[in-house]
Amino acid sequence: MPAAGPPLLLLGTPGSGKTALLFAAALEAAGEGQGPVLFLTRRPLQSMPRGTGTTLDPMRLQKIRFQYPPSTRELFRLLCSAHEAPGPAPSLLLLDGLEEYLAEDPEPQEAAYLIALLLDTAAHFSHRLGPGRDCGLMVALQTQEEAGSGDVLHLALLQRYFPAQCWLQPDAPGPGEHGLRACLEPGGLGPRTEWWVTFRSDGEMMIAPWPTQAGDPSSGKGSSSGGQP
């Protein structure tokens, strides 16, 4: 997962693997020799997400800066003061659980203000990183199978600011394994692509093109054991 690129909105129902993919993106960016990663979430992770493997590189973990703003007000304050933070600028900004912050004040103008702050903060970090280097932005939003009118309004607003979106759908590839189908809409920057993501029993995450896209519809879910795309 690249650290730079257009802002990406990660969408999925509860348990669809949003946090696991955000954490995998953080580990990937932390190992690319770039700046640190800023991971924002409402509360500390209770355990390592799926896909982190049996061993973790301590050097990568040290480059992931976790911040836990407990409310929308505290999140606003953190983002507004980000330009004052000492040290190197992050190469990737992640926010997990956007829906929890939006639920505090469902007014569209508050949601628009929060999104603008996230985009401005990522742009500021990109400026600090220097020419040819950008700070990526990934935001995870939990969706419901039956969305209310407020959820529909929020999603429509978010899609205006995040033309690149990745929809996650959980699925079970086999006993002792967890998997999901990821559909990436790059927002006019390329064709829509679909991927099969498998979390094996040993904790490793495997990614392969969705079988029908790979040109072998008969290959079935077993093809998920292939290598990285």
Curated annotation (Swiss-Prot):
Region Disordered, residue ranges: 209-229
Gene Ontology annotations of biological process type: double-strand break repair via homologous recombination; protein stabilization
Gene Ontology annotations for the cellular component aspect, listed alphabetically: nucleus; Shu complex
Disulfide bonds: none
Compartment(s) where it occurs, according to its Swiss-Prot or TrEMBL record: Nucleus
Complex formation: Interacts with ZSWIM7; they form a functional complex involved in homologous recombination repair and stabilize each other. Interacts with RAD51, RAD51B, RAD51C, RAD51D and XRCC3; involved in homologous recombination repair.
PANTHER family linked: ATPASE SWSAP1, PTHR28653
Record's function text: ATPase which is preferentially stimulated by single-stranded DNA and is involved in homologous recombination repair (HRR). Has a DNA-binding activity which is independent of its ATPase activity.
Name assigned to this protein: ATPase SWSAP1
Species for this entry: Homo sapiens
